Amino acid sequence: GWLDYHQCKWPKGFKEEEVTEYFLALNEQYLSIKNEKIISFSHFLPRIDLMPSFIPANFRIVYPALGTSHLEEQVRILNPIIHVYGHSHVNQHIVKEGIRYINNAYGYPHETNISDKQLICIYET
């Protein structure tokens, strides 16, 4: 199983879907925010197509643990100009359906070819 299941203490009998639903529910109170410009954040990927196509097939085994499309549904409700996400160790700056998605990964020390390991400015007024 994934390390997340060994390092986290979930309530006894909690299923994967219930873990997802629990964390999605924490976001509900913020989904009605309406500002001229919103920058949203999540630890997990809101959509798997944010992963670049150059990722070798043998590394795609982790894809089911990277995020959920239900998170993307919440991002769409907020309609941010930028959504910053993590969990993947692969840097990505891409626009999908009008939203700029950014992952500025630091990754593990040996992952120098997929992460820049530097701070970046994502928005200026």
Question: Language-model segments: which ranges?
Answer:
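Binuclear metal-dependent phosphoesterase catalytic core
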Residues: 52, 57-81, 89-125
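Active-site glycine-centered loops adjacent to acidic/histidine catalytic or metal-binding residues
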Residues: 43, 86-87
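Residue-identity detector for glycine
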Residues: 1, 13, 27, 35, ...
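Active-site-proximal loop/helix segment associated with metal-binding centers of metalloenzymes
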Residues: 1-62
